[in-house]
Amino acid sequence: PRRRRHAARPVRRRRRTRRSSRVHRRRRAVRRRR
């Protein structure tokens, strides 16, 4: 039997996450530096 992932708790889909925003910030910094 296949296991279902995160079936127990419903999660709202969010486009932005802390991780993506952090990466964005890093890219901006690098751009400014160059």
From Swiss-Prot:
Record GO terms (molecular function): DNA binding
Keywords attached to this entry: Chromosome, Developmental protein, Differentiation, DNA condensation, DNA-binding, Nucleosome core, Nucleus, Spermatogenesis
Keyword DNA-binding included in the entry's annotation: yes
Origin superkingdom: Eukaryota
Subcellular location: Nucleus; Chromosome
Cellular component aspect of the GO annotation: nucleosome; nucleus
Protein function: Protamines substitute for histones in the chromatin of sperm during the haploid phase of spermatogenesis. They compact sperm DNA into a highly condensed, stable and inactive complex.
Protein name: Protamine
Native organism taxonomy: Eukaryota, Metazoa, Chordata, Craniata, Vertebrata
